[in-house]
Amino acid sequence: MGETAAANNHRHHHHHGHQVFDVASHDFVPPQPAFKCFDDDGRLKRTGTVWTASAHIITAVIGSGVLSLAWAIAQLGWIAGPAVMLLFSLVTLYSSTLLSDCYRTGDAVSGKRNYTYMDAVRSILGGFKFKICGLIQYLNLFGIAIGYTIAASISMMAIKRSNCFHKSGGKDPCHMSSNPYMIVFGVAEILLSQVPDFDQIWWISIVAAVMSFTYSAIGLALGIVQVAANGVFKGSLTGISIGTVTQTQKIWRTFQALGDIAFAYSYSVVLIEIQDTVRSPPAESKTMKKATKISIAVTTIFYMLCGSMGYAAFGDAAPGNLLTGFGFYNPFWLLDIANAAIVVHLVGAYQVFAQPIFAFIEKSVAERYPDNDFLSKEFEIRIPGFKSPYKVNVFRMVYRSGFVVTTTVISMLMPFFNDVVGILGALGFWPLTVYFPVEMYIKQRKVEKWSTRWVCLQMLSVACLVISVVAGVGSIAGVMLDLKVYKPFKSTY
């Protein structure tokens, strides 16, 4: 899900090179003759098709969420695990269908376009809900930055450990602290945070997509190889047995597994941005509905394979993060490639999620203190080899670095990949994937209160709220249990 970059870049590139036509981001659009190269909102003609949209969605979905799926299925077992995944995919499919009707406010063919998820909420549901949606979305982005810091440091350590195991022939347990690796990742992100519009560099999304497919495919392949070597499918129908874990742990872990699976499917936020790259006619929503069906089918099959093979390979001992659980020591170079791919992917994906927060903070501050020199003054520094000087703004430098330091410190305080992923999945799933799309659809299509359709939509929403709450509680309980055993800043693996 980290590769939302793909969608973003595509969108930004519509108008970054063509500042002249960037009228749509303001409120007025001069009347224009129907040129062949522009759309009805004065932006350059969109060229996306069902296939480009599907590709964007697939790259936006398949990401670090894959890594915890085997663990999630291990908590739920062979019956409930795949069933829950199927359920999430169906809910996501349905809510994506509702969302695709919200790209244009009012009329599906000629209504005003909404360029992002937040635009749609603002224009359909109004100011108050827009603020709440923003709060949840920025919290989610902040949480993802923390989750990615943890995941990246775990993968860096995994490379170090696998080489250490290899050297000592498996005799040395190779315990180490994750802190130095989090700090290295943090320093890299502080530097990248200073690059303006980093999330709009076109090749980032391609790199992210290639990397996530690399490590997902390696994880899948190693799972299949391990199953073949074992000669049996491990695991049980009801998941991890009581005895291995206590009764209460089993309940918490089951709840947390729901959050982990929800996280793997949480990408509805980028759907409208992807829809904004699609050409019309036919109506964008039609193309998008096809694309959603294709991409959700592909990702669900892929997730089922990764999760099931991981569980079949390790049974109840399935690691929380498939590639770093050390179920595989050999071929160690292949594991290193997979973990390096994760790190490269997360370094870029961190920025894709952090930059919108930066943009939001900068905009809010500029509106509040328009005349403050400290906030707006830029110093130019000439960098040898670069044509244009680099502009330094003290405020930007200070608070962006502060943001990265905050996420790094929180990661060191609670470096539990699964728990954090579960919390994020729970936080984002109900409001962003279900509640807002349902509310927007009801408002858009003027669904009558207490009509059958209205009641069904509200029941779906309430059911998903319950799942979100349960997953959140389970994950928070997981953090509490982990913190009993773990001393902050002293984590070892």
Swiss-Prot record:
Optimum pH is acidic. GO terms for molecular function: symporter activity. It is a multi-pass membrane protein. Highly expressed in developing pods. Found in the vascular strands of siliques, cotyledons, leaves and roots, in the inner phloem of stems, and in the funiculi. Lower levels of expression in flowers. Not expressed in seeds. Pfam families: Aa_trans (PF01490). It comes from the Eukaryota. The chain crosses the membrane at residues 50-70, 71-91, 139-159, 176-196, 201-221, 254-274, 294-314, 341-361, 397-417, 420-440, 459-479. One of its GO terms (cellular component) is plasma membrane. InterPro entries: AA_transpt_TM (IPR013057). Residues 160-175, 222-253, 315-340, 418-419, 480-493 are extracellular. Inhibited by diethylpyrocarbonate (DEPC). It is found in: Cell membrane. Keywords: Amino-acid transport, Cell membrane, Membrane, Symport, Transmembrane, Transmembrane helix, Transport. GO terms for biological process: acidic amino acid transport; amino acid transport; neutral amino acid transport; phloem loading. Its main location: membrane. Residues 1-49, 92-138, 197-200, 275-293, 362-396, 441-458 are cytoplasmic. Belongs to the amino acid/polyamine transporter 2 family. Amino acid/auxin permease (AAAP) (TC 2.A.18.2) subfamily. Amino acid-proton symporter. Stereospecific transporter with a broad specificity for histidine, arginine, glutamate and neutral amino acids, favoring small amino acids such as alanine, asparagine and glutamine. Also accepts large aromatic residues such as phenlalanine or tyrosine. Has a much higher affinity for basic amino acids as compared with AAP1. May function in xylem-to-phloem transfer and in uptake of amino acids assimilated in the green silique tissue. This is Amino acid permease 2. It comes from Arabidopsis thaliana (Mouse-ear cress). The gene is AAP2.
